[in-house]
Amino acid sequence: MGSSGSMVKPISGFLTALIQYPVPVVESRADIDKQIQQIIKTIHSTKSGYPGLELIVFPEYSTQGLNTKKWTTEEFLCTVPGPETDLFAEACKESKVYGVFSIMEKNPGGGEPYNTAVIIDPQGEMILKYRKLNPWVPVEPWKAGDLGLPVCVGPGGSKLAVCICHDGMFPEVAREAAYKGANVLIRISGYSTQVSEQWMLTNRSNAWQNLMYTLSVNLAGYDGVFYYFGEGQVCNFDGTTLVQGHRNPWEIVTAEVYPELADQARLGWGLENNIYNLGSRGYVATPGGVKENPYTFIKDLAEGKYKVPWEDEIKVKDGSIYGYPVKKTIHS
């Protein structure tokens, strides 16, 4: 819920703050260092204003910005863990909060970099590392993530998962998080205004279809090319919006989150307990439900044979429209 009570720690559950961080205009490594210090300052100042704060979330690209001419260069990329995450970890430890941060990560094995998110706990430990499974093609050059969708224990009875921006447009990503036990899905984004309605819609549907809370926040402001919509959103496990931010840079969207209620719904609901019902179809007629997979796309995806009927007619299948070189190697 969002209320005047969203200034202090609730008796159960936890208090979160979603930071509608101003989109950084980054031209050099020095600019990145300034953003890191600004993020650290924001952690401390937000904690001082909201003493009960336990989870603070920064949007995608808040650390390194979206300079598409430089974002894959050695100067702009970071290692994870590395000096940057060490600084975030120290800030989380000092302020006694969980923090969610965005890092464009140098590929430790060489090759294309990753778009990465981390969760750091109040002891300064990195407890989750996630690489974006679904880069926003054809705009983004990031390599598709290879760490799956990890889940970690968070504050107030929460089990946390993180997805990044475009990931949230795929219902399969939210379902994977819930299937692995997450009762809170965090979505950090760097979308421009063209998809703001769809962003809010999928935040709600991801919550409802999986009986979990969704905590979502986007960059805010203008970087000289696009306007980023902010609009931090906290959705209840029934798909309703508890709190909705506006388009203001630096707006702090706070909410009280009660993971135990999502857990109770998953255990106690009959109607619309769809995260369970998916694997127990028709359990009234068939005790225990039908377990066999009826879905062609799931079978084909699992076998590496996913192909839509119109695939041969699709016009855009590489990044050339945004100036990326066309690569001939096809992943098998």
Curated annotation (Swiss-Prot):
Function: Is an aliphatic amidase with a restricted substrate specificity, as it only hydrolyzes formamide.
Domain CN hydrolase, first and last residues per copy: 14-259
Lineage: Bacteria, Bacillati, Bacillota, Bacilli, Bacillales
Entry keywords, A to Z: Hydrolase
Presence of the UniProt keyword Hydrolase in the record: yes
Record-annotated active site: 60 (proton acceptor), 132 (proton donor), 165 (nucleophile)
Residue spans crossing the bilayer: none
Enzyme kind, highest EC tier: hydrolase
HAMAP family: Formamidase
Pfam families the record matches: CN_hydrolase
A GO term for molecular function: formamidase activity
Gene3D superfamilies noted in UniProt: Carbon-nitrogen hydrolase
UniProt record, GO biological process: putrescine biosynthetic process from arginine
Family: Belongs to the carbon-nitrogen hydrolase superfamily. Aliphatic amidase family.
UniProt protein name: Formamidase
Enzyme Commission code: 3.5.1.49
Record field: catalytic activity: formamide + H2O = formate + NH4(+)
Keyword ATP-binding: no
Organism in which the protein naturally occurs: Bacillus cereus (strain G9842)
